[in-house]
Amino acid sequence: MATSKDKIRNYNANITAVGMYLPEKVLDNHYFEKIVDTNDEWIVSRTGIRERRKEENGATSDMAARAADDLIKNHNINPEEIDVIIVATVTPDMFFPATACLVQEKIGAKNAWGFDLSAACSGFLFALKTGAGLIEGGTYKKVLVIGADKMSTIINYKDRNTCLLFGDAASAVLLEPTEDLNIGVKDSILHCDGSGKESLYMKGGGSLNPPTHETVDQGLHTLYQDGKTVFKEAVKGMADISVEIMQKNNLSSDDVAYLVPHQANLRIIDATANRMGIPKEKAMVNIDKYGNTTAATIPLCLTEYYRDGKLKKGDNLVLAAFGAGFTWGSIYLTWGID
């Protein structure tokens, strides 16, 4: 089976700009002590999370547009030059039109077309690979990839197994072509396995269980997670796929500047880094501040580490994620922004 690395291409898709949006409202662990049976020490020891954000001033498209605007303003991008908008999300404003269409209008990208991509916590990786393919084909010059989720809208705040974990946020990257094949997106390995569907899902609201008074009363419109199964599969999936992409590209632990993992649980992140043979210090972490923001976690890490001066041009990165579906994957790229 051919993979992205097997193809001969003239361009790499390079991340040339980043942006982010974080809601103002902060929910710390003490907030949850008041509504469920838990405490700060337990949450930190089990998840690594201390705080998360909750959006009170808009929908997913608003957060996505604010992240895009942050990118546009900080990197002096003309929104009318954006060709394509891809929004990775599991919390769209509505089933249709696509969140990308709403973002297109809000940021003034009048010449862009776009679509949404649903792959849960792996969504940004899947969207990044899709956007890179559009760039590598030579047809498009600017592809905006956004990870955005308003998880607070599908959380049962009485369910200790899930309400502690998730936060709201959005983050964006801009992909552009480069003839310098030493930088940009270099390889990807992506997977899905539908046999894991009932371990992490929202049962109600779609065509299988359309909304009724009964589905609402039964709590089918909020997220369900089999925590033990997801933890076990996520550790294996993220660790195995990260090692696989390193071996495929002859990367040693010294060659990798950072592991950029989906921020689901600090123990999963540590286990993945350990399996890759890299020190924990080389794993990007912000789960303590924002929790699991689903499709936004990886671009949030990239944006923060770049703006803090920790990411340098030429740094080799291994991105890894695992999410509902099950979906999982890894992308190898070399950072290309000075």
Please report, for each region that a protein language model flagged, where it lies by residue.
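Short acidic capping loops at alpha-helix termini that bridge into adjacent secondary structure
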Residues: 41, 78-84, 111-113, 141-143, ...
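Short, well-ordered amphipathic alpha-helical segments that serve as non-catalytic structural scaffolds
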Residues: 39, 60-75, 99, 233-248, ...
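Condensing-enzyme catalytic core mediating Claisen C-C bond formation in acyl metabolism
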Residues: 2-57, 159-232, 236, 240, ...
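Acidic, glycine-rich active-site loops and adjacent beta-strand->loop/helix elements
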Residues: 21, 88-93, 119-122, 147-152, ...
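Flexible, glycine-rich active-site loops centered on histidine and acidic residues
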Residues: 136-170
